[in-house]
Design a protein with these regions (language model features):
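Gly/Ser/Thr-enriched, mixed-charge loops and adjacent short helices
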Residues: 34-43, 154-286, 292-294
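Short Gly/Thr/Asp-enriched flexible loops that form oxyanion-binding sites at enzyme active sites
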Residues: 102-110, 153-160, 310-329, 365
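An N-terminal, well-structured beta->alpha segment
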Residues: 2-106, 195-235, 243
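Conserved phosphate/anionic-ligand binding catalytic regions in large, soluble enzymes, centered on
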Residues: 39-59, 146-149, 239-251, 307, ...
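Phosphate-binding and adjacent anionic-ligand microenvironments
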Residues: 295, 299-301, 322-324, 342-538, ...
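N-terminal small/polar loop signature for handling phosphorylated ligands or for N-terminal nucleophile
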Residues: 90-153, 256-313
């Protein structure tokens, strides 16, 4: 561990800090715990880049850390040769406080290293950055965003030439390089305006939007159904103060939605997210303004995208007419089932269709895919793995991926992005809702019909939060305990197979035989139970918490719900 007191003093004495930054550090003088939490070591650069609260300090998100991280990334790009520097980087940012300043700081460092920069003139959805990297043939991409985290956070996500987030080997190369770089003296910089004049920085804007949106709109399968219900079909949309505010409504209107109602208060771009505690479409509480508007105008369907517009959540009216949240698992199943039918009806289904999901996403999606002649493949959590799998399958000529999704409200569609894309997903989910509306059904009705057809699947994710400096130790201890002393039964139901994605082992609990899985190299444990339930445990990659996923199935809705309750009670015992 770094001598945090010495590092704190070094920052205080540095000429690199301005008066406000020094005042912020002087204000915590004497607060040992706060000083330690800011200076105990540098932020760890992972495959998701960096994410943290915005404060002055080595272990925080600020302009100095952004420059330092960018210098490491620039060195890795430069190591690929002059052509890579010429291809350059695309840079994008979300609506958060400091996002624009951080993005410009990253551009200045890239330019000073002779790397060509294409930077968006203002905030854009994350999928548009992935598109820009691919469209302009860039070597890499940088996105300043903390996605759906609270307002105190910001982040730095990095992409490679395929438009996907960085593969582990490149992330490791950057992390290794950063160990050699002094945060103040080791970073090259060139003033933004000078770099523009020198032709090293160019601005991206409307032209890129048009190219991106032409790809998005080409994904439409069925305008006829939308036109059929256009006069009565009503949609409420909220961007939660973020990047979806322009392109999502444009996509829906382009689809033929006549009655689109946007939540005015949340169409205001604001990185403090004044109307919500959390700008996360996974949290139904944030939809209160959208529900009020939907009730006022008589809409049955609500869409909400997170601040960087890579994830989308929906709400629909339930059996009693009140709005209920449809989970990411359920939305994905609905969309997959719909797309298979819609693509076949439109003559757009490829010869060997594939569908990708993560290991923690509902098994109902596999059932839907395989029942309809679509091959299903699992990947680790994160769209970089799904992008990698899509690239590999298609390059080998094995088939074509029609959809990829994960349970946390992310969907990757089409061939023009390699990350989750709430713009395209919003378009196709709305097309689906209109198609069902033409049949006199809501998406709630549609979901019940799918349960009757494919089985009563149910899922629940628990977050075991472990904050503080000892949080990581507690997380490691829990994972170690589950490995060294694994449960023989869970909530009274026998564990039949125990899988460890770290080493790829699969243990048959009855015989003790050990088999090998296709996937390995990730800190995830999987317990498959005698009643068909699967429980997965993994540490979060971005926050101090252990995530526990319950994937179950019942003979009917009541049995499914009882299973979720039973296994949820067991999960709570893990931290006792």
């Amino acid at each position: 561990m770094l001598d945090y007191k010495r590092e704190y003093e070094r920052w205080l004495a540095s000429d690199a800090l301005n008066a406000d930054e020094k005042a912020e550090l002087q204000a915590i003088a004497g607060d040992e715990k706060e000083i330690e939490s800011r200076f105990y070591g540098p932020m760890e650069f992972g495959t998701a880049g960096l994410r943290g609260t915005m404060k002055v300090g080595l272990h925080q998100m600020n302009v100095h850390v952004i420059r330092w991280a960018t210098q490491g990334f620039a060195d890795v790009i430069a190591a690929e040769g002059d052509e890579a520097k010429q291809k350059g980087v695309a840079i994008c940012m979300d609506c958060r406080v400091n996002s624009m300043a951080f993005a410009r700081a990253a551009a200045e460092v890239c330019a000073a290293n002779g790397i060509r920069v294409r930077i968006f003139e203002s905030l854009r959805p994350t999928p548009e950055l992935s598109f820009a990297v691919r469209y302009y043939g860039c070597q890499a991409g940088i996105n300043v965003t903390a996605s759906h985290n609270p307002k105190e956070y910001n982040g730095y996500k990095v992409y490679w030439a395929d438009g996907a987030q960085l593969p582990p080997q490149h992330a490791a190369a950057i992390a290794a390089r950063l160990e050699q770089i002094d945060i103040f003296t080791g970073v090259k910089r060139m003033a933004f305006d000078d770099a523009v004049k020198a032709g090293l920085i160019t601005l991206l804007g409307e032209e890129t939007d048009k190219m991106f949106m032409s790809n998005v709109m080409a994904m439409v399968n069925d305008r006829t159904s939308v036109a059929q219900v256009a006069d009565s079909f009503k949609v409420v949309y909220t961007p939660f103060h973020g990047c979806g505010w322009k392109l999502v409504p444009e996509a829906l209107r382009g689809l033929g939605v006549k009655n689109l109602y946007c939540v005015e208060q949340q169409m205001v771009l604001d990185g403090t997210f004044p109307t919500v505690a959390s700008p996360n479409p996974e949290n139904p509480e944030g939809f209160y303004l959208a529900i009020d508007l939907a009730d006022k105008v008589g809409a049955d369907f609500i869409l909400g995208t997170d601040p960087d517009s890579d994830r989308v959540g929906i709400m629909v009216r339930g059996a009693d007419g009140k709005f209920i949240a449809v989970t990411g698992n359920q939305t994905g199943v609905l969309l997959l089932d719909y797309l298979i039918g819609a693509m076949r009806r439109a003559g757009k289904m490829p010869e060997h269709p594939y569908f990708l999901k993560t290991i923690v996403t509902t098994e109902m999606a596999r059932k839907v895919a395989e029942s309809n002649g679509v091959t299903c493949c699992d990947t680790f959590t994160g769209f970089k793995f799904m992008a990698e799998k899509k690239n590999a399958l298609e390059a080998a000529g094995e088939g074509h991926v029609i959809m990829s999704y994960e349970e946390s409200y992310g969907y990757m569609l089409g061939d023009y992005v390699r990350d989750k894309d709430a713009v395209t997903a919003s378009l196709l989910i709305t097309e689906m809702a209109a198609w069902y509306a033409a049949k006199g059904m809501t998406l709630y009705d549609a979901l019940q019909a799918l349960y009757k057809k494919y089985g009563w699947y149910g899922e629940k994710t628990h977050n075991l939060v472990m904050p503080g400096l000892d949080g990581l130790e507690k997380m490691a201890a829990l994972m170690k305990r589950l490995r060294t002393a694994p449960p023989a039964n869970i909530a009274g139901v026998d564990v039949v197979v125990r899988k460890d994605y770290q080493d790829g082992s699969a243990v048959d609990c009855a015989t003790g035989n050990v088999g090998k899985m296709e996937l390995s190299g990730s800190n995830v444990l999987r317990f498959e139970l005698a009643d068909g339930t699967t429980i997965l445990v993994r540490p979060s990659g971005t926050e101090p918490k252990i995530k526990v996923y319950i994937l179950t199935k019942g003979a009917d809705a009541a049995e499914r719900d009882a299973n979720i309750e039973k296994y949820s009670a067991w999960v709570k015992t893990l931290t006792e």
